[in-house]
Amino acid sequence: HVKLLVRQFLRRANTTSQPWFLYVGFHDPHRCGHTQPQYGAFCERFGSGEPGMGSIPDWQPWYYQWDEVQLPYHIQDTEPARRDVAAQYTTMSRLDQGVALVLKEIEMAGHADDTLIIYTSDNGIPFPSGRTNLYDPGMREPLIVVSPDPKARRNEASGAMVSLLDIMPTMLDWYNVSTPDKEMTNDIRFWDNDNPKSFLPVLEKEPTPSADDAVFASQTHHEVTMYFPMRAVRTRKYKLIHNLNYGMPFPVDQDLYVSPTFQ
């Protein structure tokens, strides 16, 4: 169980004065209907307490009516697609409750007031034009940051342009570790032009928007058989996607291909 593993880690961390880093990954809300169809398209029935589904003690399932869910703009308005989205929303609620358990463990270990918490995802929504694409639905990921710094803003949404590339320099900044010198890196360009950079300053003050604001993205293969290299740059006004091998057929991920939405 994730919460027990987190508890075990924090107990070890409390035996030393050294700073620690904990990465917790959840399967939710990934698809799993292509490998475990008995649990539903997103394994939304797994652990629900239904006959044959097992039970997750800390999870109270939330269900959504397929004809009432709000659809993202890029998903077709059909009953199969709506049922697909409703199933994912159920697993999102399971994820939400799982994150709450992790936060509770951090609090119980006495680290609620000295831990920087970053919540995000690894890719966009697994629907058409989403994951494995560099269209906006494929790049949009949640980013919630909670800082114990008393100077940090609370309960505010930011318009700062950041990407997951910024997490590493942010963590180095948090630990007061200097970023590598250019001559020490394999790719000197990685540290040029302040990109990526720490977003800790954003937690204290909203940056002034600039025409030079930009984030970068890349996609090469989601699976070893899904090679289709793409690169993208997004500014506040424009976006450019460069398909490096545009003449080849675009590969569709297996779990998306067999999904109710795609079929």
Could you tell me what each predicted segment is?
Residues 9-168, 172-193, 219, 232, ...:
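Active-site-proximal cap/lid insertion segments
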Residues 209-212, 216, 228:
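His-Asp-centered acyl/peptidyl-transfer active-site segments
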Residues 2-7:
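Acidic, His- and aromatic-enriched active-site or binding-groove loops in soluble protein domains
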Residues 169-172, 199-200, 204:
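Two-component system phosphotransfer/interaction surface
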Residues 196-201, 212-215:
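Polar, glycine-rich mid-to-C-terminal structural blocks
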Residues 15, 107, 204-210:
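Basic phosphate/pyrophosphate-binding loop/patch that engages nucleotide-derived ligands
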